[in-house]
Amino acid sequence: MLAGLAGGRVGWALDAAQDPSLLEQRQAVLAALAQALNGGTVKRFRLAEALAGSDPEAIDDALGLWLSWLRDVLLVVEGCPERIVNRDQQAEIEAAARQLDSRDLQAAIRAVQAARAQVASAINTRMALEVLMLRLPPVTSPARPDPARPAR
């Protein structure tokens, strides 16, 4: 499973096999994304503030993981669940896929990519992250019906 979660980063997979705290950090980053998607504006801005206090490399890593997770949700929405990378998050990914559509996910992916580029170019990190938080779609709306399940 670590090889898949590493996303081609052999060094990370080897490090994670030796240091379980890397997996805990990964879970914390994904929990932050869940907070952003499920939270209101105030919660999102607090998260942006906390994330902005990290070093640029940590922010880039976090946003990269967010991209990977959002990509997996998009794959499920588009009917390709077998291609997801974050298999340890499959239940969460499927739940998000029932609440978001392809357009929302593509917009979220573009917003994360833009924030990542802005952080890399030393633009005001906190402002870039706040804009990202405003652009993420909410997943607190009622779940869409699962297309694989027949209607009752």
Question: Model-found features: residue ranges?
Answer:
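Charged, glycine-rich active-site and insertion segments that engage polyanionic ligands
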Residues: 1-65, 69-85, 89-152
